[in-house]
Amino acid sequence: MERNTNPNRQPVELNRTSLYLGLLLVAVLGILFSSYFFN
């Protein structure tokens, strides 16, 4: 039972981490673009 719960939770965490990383990347890109436009 424990072995089945672990693999199921891992993919969910990976998906959430990937989403958070994507949001962070978008934020960084937005800041970079804004800085370029302001300059």
UniProtKB/Swiss-Prot annotation:
Membrane-crossing residue ranges in chain numbering: 18-38
Cellular component terms (Gene Ontology): photosystem II reaction center; plasma membrane-derived thylakoid membrane
BP terms from Gene Ontology: photosynthesis
InterPro entries: PSII_PsbL, PSII_PsbL_sf
UniProt entry tagged with the keyword Zinc-finger: no
Alphabetized SUPFAM superfamilies for the sequence: Photosystem II reaction center protein L, PsbL (SSF161017)
Compartments where located: Cellular thylakoid membrane
Topological category with respect to the lipid bilayer: Single-pass membrane protein
Keyword Transcription assigned: no
Keyword annotations: Membrane, Photosynthesis, Photosystem II, Reaction center, Thylakoid, Transmembrane, Transmembrane helix
Residue pairs linked by disulfide bridges in the UniProt entry: none
Functional description taken from the UniProt entry: One of the components of the core complex of photosystem II (PSII). PSII is a light-driven water:plastoquinone oxidoreductase that uses light energy to abstract electrons from H(2)O, generating O(2) and a proton gradient subsequently used for ATP formation. It consists of a core antenna complex that captures photons, and an electron transfer chain that converts photonic excitation into a charge separation. This subunit is found at the monomer-monomer interface and is required for correct PSII assembly and/or dimerization.
Oligomeric form and interacting partners: PSII is composed of 1 copy each of membrane proteins PsbA, PsbB, PsbC, PsbD, PsbE, PsbF, PsbH, PsbI, PsbJ, PsbK, PsbL, PsbM, PsbT, PsbX, PsbY, PsbZ, Psb30/Ycf12, peripheral proteins PsbO, CyanoQ (PsbQ), PsbU, PsbV and a large number of cofactors. It forms dimeric complexes.
HAMAP family for this protein: PSII_PsbL (MF_01317)
Family, per entry: Belongs to the PsbL family.
Protein name: Photosystem II reaction center protein L
Gene: psbL
